[in-house]
Each structure stands twice: as structure tokens, then as C-alpha cells.
Amino acid sequence: MCERAARLCRAGAHRLLREPPPQGRALGGLLRWVGARMGEPRAPLVPDIPAADPDPGPAAPRGGTAVILDIFRRADKNDDGKLSLEEFQLFFADGVLNEKELEGLFHTIDSDNTNHVDTKELCDYFVEHMGDYEDVLASLETLNHSVLKAMGYTKKVYEGGNNVDQFVTRFLLKETANQIQSLLSSVESAVEAIEEQTSQIRQDHCKPSPGVNESRYGGPTPPYIPNHKLVVPEPVKSLPVAIGEPKEEGLEVQISRLAELIGRLESKTLSFDLQQRLSDEEGTNMYLQLVRQEMAVCPEQLGEFLDSLRQYLRSTAEERNCFHVAAVRMADGLTFVIYEFWETEEEWKRHLQSPVCKAFRHVKVDTLSQPEALSQISVPAAWCTSGRD
């Protein structure tokens, strides 16, 4: 009897274990849990707010900043990390803004009133005024990096590639140059149009007058970097000023002193035969503009400077309104003086905006060891008509 009862108990237990739990009981428990949760007081929902970054880090630099900063570093001739008013005027003078306007711009950028503008402060000012040029300068940064990378690839192909690889690389290189040149031509056309307008403005406001003139002119950037400083050397300041119709005796004194001065500077006599272009009977201007540039060149940049100087002299000599141009190399081998005779001061200022003059200025920014000294003076045209000795 006991054994049978035990078997029945075990069979019942196994049956209960095999049967699934009653569905109604489970569903009822779930409904009771949901009802209890719905009856609880509920706090209003608040959207998740991302936690504040304790250290967001510096903001990403604006596009094109690296290009502008690199250009302005070149204006810092003494590499002290800041620009003085003199360096600022030297770099940015373009013949349109006068010295007073440039000084006002300098103090506007010099927000901390230290009488110096650091290159970052200068860069920040121009970045805020870049407009659509931000994308252009940012693209130049990328283009510069890509071109350098492509040049490395070209070298690698030409050192170890087959003829087909070299052909493809050569084709792509030429097409790249053509595309870049096409873009450059468009930009240069815009520059020339603007320069033509500004040249007309200068013609309306500038009137040539005989005598000694001291002023600042220049042409950056960026692509053309200004680098002119018009500082009259001490010997020129001692020359008498010719105003109006001087007496014949005073004119002779001026001619003698001017000839002596240039003779000392060049260690030789300048002589020109310009009678055919300077006839008083034709009402030709009685004065010429003599422009003198003195430049000290860095020894390691001498070759580049000489190549650019030769090109500048050839091109300037071909200009119709330039009567004569000559360059003299001083005894130290690193100092050069250029003399230019122009029909009028306006013609010389127009020459400052020519492509050859801008290209020469661009080279001077990189090759000169100090700012150039430049002076101009009106000289009697009759002095240039003497024959060669």
C-alpha cells in the first residue's frame, strides 16, 4: 500500500513538471503590475541634456589662415614676431592709401595700443574681412599640399616607372599646369582691371611738381607682395629744391651737385644722349623724374635676386616713358643701386603697378636683408642731353 502511494505521488509530480504554467495566471500577474505602475505618481518628462564638455578645446582655425599668416610673417623683416608702423607701411603701401590713412589702419588693428601689431593680430583682422576669399585661400592650402604630394609621386614614377607610367604622369602634370595657369590668368585679368581703375584715380589726384619729393610707395602680398620704402638718403636732402623757373646760376649749381653725387655713388659718370626726345621747341617737360633704389641683398639669395634684376632692367628699358635705367653693384658685392629716369612722376607711379615691377617687388621681399631705400627727385631735362664723353 505504501509503495503504491509513493508511485502515484511521483507520477503526479512528473506530470506537473511537464505541464506549461497556466497562461491566465501569468497574464493576470502582468496586468496587476501594469496597473500598479500606472497608479504611481509620475514626474514630468524632461528631455535629456548632453553633459557639458569640461574642456571643449580651441576652435578650429578659419580656412586660409595659414596662407595669410605665412604672407604676413614675411613682412616682419627683423623676425621679432610683430610689425612696427614703419614695417606696416612698407608692406602695405600701394600708392592709393596715403601715409596718414595707412597709419590710421595700423592703429585700428593695434587694438591693445602697443604701437606694434603682431602677425596673429594682423591675421585675425584680415580673416574677419576675407569674405568669399576664405574659400579661395583654404583651397590654396589644400592645393599646395596636393601639388607637393604629386611632385613626390612624379619623382618616384620617373625614377622607377616604365615608359607608359611616365607618359601618363607627364600628361597629368602638363594638364595640371594648364588648369592652374588658366585660373591664374582669370585672377590676373581682375587684378589688371582694378589696377587700371586705381591708376586713373591716382592720375586725378597726383600732379607732378619739380623738386625733391619724399613719400612712401609700394605694391603682400600675397600675389604680389609690396616692398617699397621711400627714404631719401642724407646727401639728397642737401640738394637745393628747384621750384618754378630758377635762375641760370642756381640751375648750374644743381646740375653740378647732382652730377657729383651720382658720380660718388656709382664711381663713374652717367651720360645719356636724349636730345632727340627732349626738345624744348616741342614743349617737352623741362624736368625728368630721377628714381633711385638702393638694396642690400642676403648672400644666400644673391642668385635669385640677380636673375630678377636682369629681367626687370630689360623690361623697364623697353617702356616708352622710361628714358634710361641703369644698375650699379657696389664694392661689397651685395648692395645694388638702380637709377631710373622717367618723363613724369605719374609715369613712374604707373610703372609701379606693371606686372614686371610687381614681380620684382615679390622677389625683393624674399631676397633683401633690410628694407630698400628709395628716393625720387626732379632733375633738369637739359642735364640728360649732354653727349657721351
Swiss-Prot record:
Residues 63-98, 99-132 form the EF-hand domain. Residues 173-198 form a coiled coil. It is found in: Cytoplasm; Cell projection, Dendrite; Cell projection, Axon; Cell membrane. CDD domains: EFh. The modification Omega-N-methylarginine is found at R10. It comes from the Eukaryota. GO terms for cellular component: axon; cytoplasm; dendrite; plasma membrane; postsynapse; presynapse. The modification Asymmetric dimethylarginine is found at R42. One of its GO terms (biological process) is positive regulation of protein localization to membrane. Residues 289-377 form the ABM domain. InterPro entries: ABM_dom, Dimeric_a/b-barrel, EF-hand-dom_pair, EF_Hand_1_Ca_BS, EF_hand_dom, NECAB1/2/3. Ca(2+) 2 binds at D110, D112, T114, H116, E121. GO terms for molecular function: A2A adenosine receptor binding; calcium ion binding; type 5 metabotropic glutamate receptor binding. Gene3D superfamilies: 3.30.70.100, EF-hand. Disulfide bonds: none annotated. Keywords: Calcium, Cell membrane, Cell projection, Coiled coil, Cytoplasm, Membrane, Metal-binding, Methylation, Repeat. Expressed in the striatum; predominantly in the caudate putamen. Expressed in hippocampus; particularly strong in the CA1 area. Expressed in the spinal dorsal horn with especially strong expression in lamina IIi; found in excitory synaptic boutons (at protein level). Pfam families: ABM, EF-hand_7. Transmembrane segments: none annotated. May act as a signaling scaffold protein that senses intracellular calcium. Can modulate ligand-induced internalization of ADORA2A and coupling efficiency of mGluR5/GRM5; for both receptors may regulate signaling activity such as promoting MAPK1/3 (ERK1/2) activation. Interacts (calcium-dependent) with ADORA2A and GRM5. This is N-terminal EF-hand calcium-binding protein 2. It comes from Rattus norvegicus. The lineage of its organism: Eukaryota, Metazoa, Chordata, Craniata, Vertebrata.
